[in-house]
């Protein structure tokens, strides 16, 4: 499987065209090609399921789980991907199917326009599957999502599906993404309570410790339960920071807060942490020798040679005993390179918190105290051009409120921008998965202000895209009617000229330019 590859699903695609001999993410030609083989087998399963009735959910659950393994920065273990391919083939045999998997190569579609439409749909679908997989871990699922996943994969598998049909499915993918995010929000809040506003400290303690990175809250819950009386502290890294805002997690005194920065700073953060690291979703970078002997993966994450915590059995927890035993033997964390931050950034501005005072916020808008809301959300990455998001936030006038979700927050979440009539100018909504809260807040603000359409709200969007969850969020926003969204630091490599024409003409999608120019344009509603 070694040799050539083609992958352009993330923002780090080489030359903004595509990676052909390994990716900066750590993907090799072997794992890239295996992931494409897996998707081809999943298409065959979807083609088999399409039109059938009375089929159990187990096949849809498998598709969602397997698609989640193909997100950027998730699974670089060939053995694990081979196992998923074999599982797909077993599903076909169970279904008594003679459907053959289509050509797995992205480049097998020679027409670049058609290829772009197909891959745009697949990448949005990956984001939907990731949201759904997180909800499924908590026992929540929705047939509307499963039915769409099967329909969309089937359409992408058929060589005669016209790009007009694919375009309609891309739009529908945005609608389903909203449903998937709403489902995940319901799962999280039903299980752990609604996030509450709080400061989250970034400060190293004196006990041996475990650092959990990723976005799967169920894993953190089970780890906290298993370490409750172990005199081991637990910290969060990257997007897992949001867990500190849920009431169910805050009852654990050994959950100490955040450590380090965004997912991509993990090489330095994991090295200085000293303790054990567990990565549970799409945020793993190439593992460095400084911490190779004390990192574990779980969920759909995989790195060859790194120990893996296997799936939980029904009615049981995952077994973190090996992680805990190793943590006992290791020294406490040292301060991260960024140093301690106490009391830490304010987080927990979920829709339940913000919407409870939405009428008051609307009055501040009507009085001119708040002139505009700027949503700076999405994922972070290594690209130096992402410093734009820091400078943009600094350039925004003092009568603006910044809403953020996802790793993009780490570009500015420790800045002190003050408050407007008691409202913090930076409102951290949560993970990229929690972008649903931004949608809910916007809809409630629309109601409170009596504005007919969402695109007329005093709200501007600047998305920091990196991977497929942000693609799904982007599609959800477009489907709901938001316009003039800025997307950076670059446009996706899979945006063909035809796709770009539609996005700019019909939705007003824009590239980022300079922080000062974009800040001024957004204040004018552009």
Predicted regions mapped to residue ranges:
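Anaerobic metallocofactor- and corrinoid-dependent redox/one-carbon enzyme cores
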Residues: 2-21, 27-36, 44, 172-526
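Long, compositionally biased, glycine/small-hydrophobic-enriched stretches that function as flexible linkers
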Residues: 2-207, 211, 231, 238-241, ...
């Amino acid at each position: 499987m070694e040799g050539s590859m083609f992958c352009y699903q993330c923002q780090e695609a080489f030359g903004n065209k595509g990676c052909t001999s390994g990716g900066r993410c750590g993907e090799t030609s072997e794992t890239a090609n295996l992931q494409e083989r897996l998707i081809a087998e999943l298409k065959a399963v979807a083609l088999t399921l399409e039109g059938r009735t009375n089929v159990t959910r187990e096949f849809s659950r498998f598709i969602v789980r397997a698609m989640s393994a193909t997100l950027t920065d998730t699974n670089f273990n060939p053995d694990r991907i081979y196992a998923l391919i074999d599982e797909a083939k077993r599903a076909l045999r169970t279904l008594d199917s003679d459907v053959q998997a289509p050509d797995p190569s992205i480049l097998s579609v020679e027409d670049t326009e058609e290829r772009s439409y197909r891959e745009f749909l697949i990448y949005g679908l990956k984001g939907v599957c990731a949201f759904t997989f997180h909800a499924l871990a908590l026992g929540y699922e929705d047939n509307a999502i499963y039915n769409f996943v099967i329909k969309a994969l089937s359409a992408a598998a058929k060589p005669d599906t016209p790009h007009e049909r694919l375009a309609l499915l891309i739009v529908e993918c945005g609608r389903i993404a909203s449903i998937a995010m709403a489902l995940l929000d319901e799962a999280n809040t039903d299980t752990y309570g609604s996030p509450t506003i709080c400061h989250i400290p970034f400060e190293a303690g004196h006990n041996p410790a475990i650092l959990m990175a990723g976005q799967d809250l169920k894993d953190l819950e089970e780890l906290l339960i298993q370490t409750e009386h172990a005199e081991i502290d637990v910290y969060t890294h990257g997007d897992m920071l949001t867990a500190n805002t849920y009431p169910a997690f805050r009852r654990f005194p050994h959950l100490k807060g955040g450590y380090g920065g965004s997912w991509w700073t993990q090489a330095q953060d994991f090295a200085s942490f000293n303790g054990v690291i567990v990565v549970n979703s799409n945020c793993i970078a190439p593992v460095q020798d400084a911490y190779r002997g004390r990192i574990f993966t779980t969920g759909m994450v995989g790195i060859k040679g790194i120990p893996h915590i296997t799936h939980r059995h029904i009615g049981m927890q995952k077994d973190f005993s090996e992680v805990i035993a190793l943590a006992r033997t290791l020294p406490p964390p040292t301060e991260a390179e960024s140093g301690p931050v106490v009391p830490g950034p304010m987080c927990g501005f979920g829709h339940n918190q913000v919407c409870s005072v939405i009428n008051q916020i609307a009055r501040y808008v009507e009085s001119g105290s708040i002139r505009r809301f700027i949503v700076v959300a999405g994922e972070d990455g290594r690209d130096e051009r992402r410093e734009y998001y820091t400078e943009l936030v600094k350039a925004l006038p003092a009568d603006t409120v910044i809403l953020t979700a996802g790793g993009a927050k780490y570009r500015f979440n420790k800045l002190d921008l003050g408050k407007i009539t008691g409202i913090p100018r930076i409102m951290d909504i949560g993970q990229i998965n929690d972008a649903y809260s931004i949608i809910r807040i916007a809809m409630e603000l629309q109601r409170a202000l009596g504005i007919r359409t969402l695109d007329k709200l005093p709200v501007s969007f600047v998305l920091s895209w990196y991977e497929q969850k942000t693609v799904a969020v982007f599609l959800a926003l477009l489907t709901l009617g938001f316009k003039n969204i800025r997307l950076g630091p670059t446009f996706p490599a899979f945006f063909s000229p035809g796709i770009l024409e539609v996005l700019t003409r019909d939705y007003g999608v824009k590239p980022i330019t300079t922080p000062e120019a974009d800040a001024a344009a957004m204040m004018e509603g552009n």
